[in-house]
Amino acid sequence: MSVLTVALDAMGGDFGPSETVPAAAQALSLLPKLNILLVGDQNQLVPLLQQHALSSHPRLHLVHASQSVSMAERPVIALRNKTDSSMRVMLELVSSGRAQACVSGGNTGALMVMAMRVLTMLPHLKRPALCSSLPNLHGRHTVMLDLGCNVNCTPEMLWQFACLGDLFAKHVHAVSSPKIALLNVGEEVIKGSKLVQETAKLLASDKQFNYIGFLEGDQLISGQADVIVCDGFTGNIALKTAEGIARFFYSQIKASNEADKVKNKSNTAAEIQTSLSVMHPDHYNGASLLGLNGIVIKSHGRADRRALSNAILHAVAEIEQQLPRRISERFIAEHTYER
């Protein structure tokens, strides 16, 4: 059994070590082949490791970092001044080969610029894209990107994102010929901005894609497409709206279930709550920063230990599929990026 090593930014996210340490414990208990490098301030981490009986765990190793990056910090300032931050040290562990992937719930902008500096982009790729897998109505997954890295995009960038999403769907979700769609304000071919229209022409003319046209926002989880491509501004708003609605319904049904228990009523609400749990954002936490010379997983900033543990497991899946190597091979082998 080969050992897989993930570096975890212990100081990242809204809750920091109080959730990252127990998340590491959960992930280690689920995967016997997993090693975790826990990166952060040892003065804060050592007491928590003792509290969770992890001080002498053979598969967890503490890597000290004296600084951390706040959620409000400007990315360029963090890049310049936080060279010993838990985020930066985590990325350097991947760059040096000590870790095969890394996970952070920290500042997204800082993570992107640091990752581009430390790991660099794969050949021929312009920018990284943030990619997530959403559960859909067919019981499968729909890959969506970009989810916030790139607010201003060109058609060539969206074409590259389609390539990344296509590879992700094939190798992570085992979809042989992923159906690719562009997120738009309507399904009709005449609808959409100049960016969307020009990107549609690129995708439709490229025979390597199974391009199916436009999808609207209410079709994100319909299962009509395996990959949905959009700019980071649109994608971030669409995803967070969907997650907010999912959390609302889940919390309402959970409250109804608790009320039923008090009143000794039937278990209908509990059954619905169980069915909907797969739609809860915590269940699919962990967005991939694709296009880099290394595996970088961005967790929700407000993720709890269960959600963070899922992000770590997501990193392991990408290690096993050797995703950066597959992406690099695709872009080196095909020169269609030169448009």
Swiss-Prot record:
Statement: the UniProt record of this protein carries the keyword Lipid biosynthesis: yes
Gene3D superfamilies: Isopropylmalate Dehydrogenase
Subcellular location: Cytoplasm
GO biological process per UniProt: fatty acid biosynthetic process; phospholipid biosynthetic process
Record keywords: Cytoplasm, Lipid biosynthesis, Lipid metabolism, Phospholipid biosynthesis, Phospholipid metabolism, Transferase
Chemical reaction(s) catalysed: a fatty acyl-[ACP] + phosphate = an acyl phosphate + holo-[ACP]
GO cellular component: cytoplasm
Pathway where this protein functions: Lipid metabolism; phospholipid metabolism
Lipid metabolism among keywords: yes
Function: Catalyzes the reversible formation of acyl-phosphate (acyl-PO(4)) from acyl-[acyl-carrier-protein] (acyl-ACP). This enzyme utilizes acyl-ACP as fatty acyl donor, but not acyl-CoA.
Similarity annotation: Belongs to the PlsX family.
Oligomeric and partner information: Homodimer. Probably interacts with PlsY.
Name this protein carries in UniProt: Phosphate acyltransferase
Organism: Tolumonas auensis (strain DSM 9187 / NBRC 110442 / TA 4)
Lineage: Bacteria, Pseudomonadati, Pseudomonadota, Gammaproteobacteria, Aeromonadales
Encoding gene per record: plsX
